[in-house]
Amino acid sequence: MKRDNRYCLVCLPRNRTIYFHQNEDGKVWLFCNKCDRGYSLEQYCEIADIDLTEFLTGDFHMQEAKPDEVQAMAWPSTFIPLSDPRAARGVEYVKSRGLKPDGDMYYDMKEDGVVFPYYVDNHFCGAQVRFVDVRIDEDGKEWKITTLPGTRLGLLFGMWNQAKLFPNIKAVVVCEGYFNALALQQAFNTKYGGISNNPWKCIALSGSSVSEHQAESLKDLKDQGYKVIAAPDTDGAGLKMLAKMKEKDCITHYSLTNDTEKDWNNLLQDIGHDELAKFFMKSIRSINE
């Protein structure tokens, strides 16, 4: 008889508390109601001290997430504000990137990384964690970031909860990664003397892929009269992202670093906030050019 994997091996409850789900990329993750957190299969087996192969021989009861919905999550207890003294390593890392430790970032005490949270309206719906120290995965490749299980990146934007934009916003800048969006946001906040005077809203796709939901959301902003400016990396993946956004008719302009080795955060480290804002604005081109 197969072991019922719905009994959590971490908190050891008397009843079934685990629910299994599958992301768009086919990866399986689980959520324990009593632990009040999600796990990837690898995380769970490591914490529960069980061999992954042995665990996979057990019985699974899959519950598919609905295709166009995100789920509100409980805030993990290991996520703490950067103002907390225990977050010193996170603050040091953010500063090493030329960034100010301002904005909606946190520190994950367990993973030793900077947390980028995702929201829809006022609901926390997931996060990514950028490790302070780069790790090496089982295939020998660099591993820089992990995603909180259950986070549906294709339905979310970094630094935008998909609510109505503030009245002062006139243009939306769409970057690949959170640090790039944050670099540009801080640059424009500096230029305009604060966020309340800044007409630019910088957001992130969390990668170079543009989902149908993200494209539709950006096209809606464009149709409302906002300038929507793609700001991908100047590499193969970034240029493919730009081409797809043009094809989806969800942008009005684009801006590139024109350096295959440097993204917007790299430029910030080189030239500072004021000069980055100037450089970006001078680099803006219409998609019709």
Regions found by a protein language model. Give the residues of each.
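A generic alpha-helix surface/boundary motif
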Residues: 39, 88-89, 178
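Broad, structure-driven detector of short, well-ordered beta-strand segments within folded domains
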Residues: 16-24, 107, 128-130
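TOPRIM metal-binding catalytic domain and adjacent DNA-binding surface shared by DnaG-type primases
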Residues: 1-15, 46-125, 162-167, 282-289
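TOPRIM fold recognition
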Residues: 9, 30-33, 169-170, 178-289
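Short Cys/His-based metal-binding microdomains
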Residues: 19-55
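Phosphate-handling DNA/RNA-contact segment within nucleic-acid enzymes
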Residues: 111-224
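Short glycine-/small-residue-rich flexible loop motifs, especially phosphate/cofactor-binding loops
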Residues: 42, 91, 181
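Structural detector of coil-to-beta-strand junctions
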Residues: 15-18, 29, 113-115, 172
